Amino acid sequence: MEQALKQARLAFDKNEVPVGVVIVYRLNQKIIVSSHNNIEEKNNALCHAEIIAINEACNLISSKNLNDYDIYVTLEPCAMCASAISHSRLKRLFYGASDSKQGAVESNLRYFNSSACFHRPEIYSGILSEHSRFLMKEFFQKMRSTID
């Protein structure tokens, strides 16, 4: 999760919502890809950290199925990202801070408990959540101060 937090800090420094992700091969715990939100730079609402990382991982291993991989995310995934995690069949999801507005794992939609979900990863929440929450709070304070 520390590496995902480093990615979130990179996003913060680029004025992107500070969400970071790493995907790890379960058998040796090696990070195969890391990413962060890139929505503003790419001018593309689909460029969430999870989507970028899943796309890169699938390309790297030449497979749409990531059964032997885990994903670490600094913020609870939204509905789009939760669906991508399910469709790519990631084994385990570890995330930091909950997202009371857009979170779709445990906060709101609970995508993985819905009938629309065909693969449910093992879910572990609250991993270094205080660091993720602090970074999000700092980011939105910074954004509000530039608007004023």
UniProtKB/Swiss-Prot annotation:
PROSITE patterns: CYT_DCMP_DEAMINASES_1, CYT_DCMP_DEAMINASES_2
Record InterPro entries: APOBEC/CMP_deaminase_Zn-bd, CMP_dCMP_dom, Cytidine_deaminase-like, tRNA_aden_deaminase
Required cofactor(s): Zn(2+)
GO molecular function: tRNA-specific adenosine-34 deaminase activity; zinc ion binding
Keywords per UniProt: Hydrolase, Metal-binding, tRNA processing, Zinc
PANTHER family according to UniProt: CYTOSINE DEAMINASE FAMILY MEMBER (PTHR11079), TRNA(ADENINE(34)) DEAMINASE, CHLOROPLASTIC (PTHR11079:SF179)
Name of this chain's protein: tRNA-specific adenosine deaminase
Lineage: Bacteria, Pseudomonadati, Pseudomonadota, Alphaproteobacteria, Rickettsiales
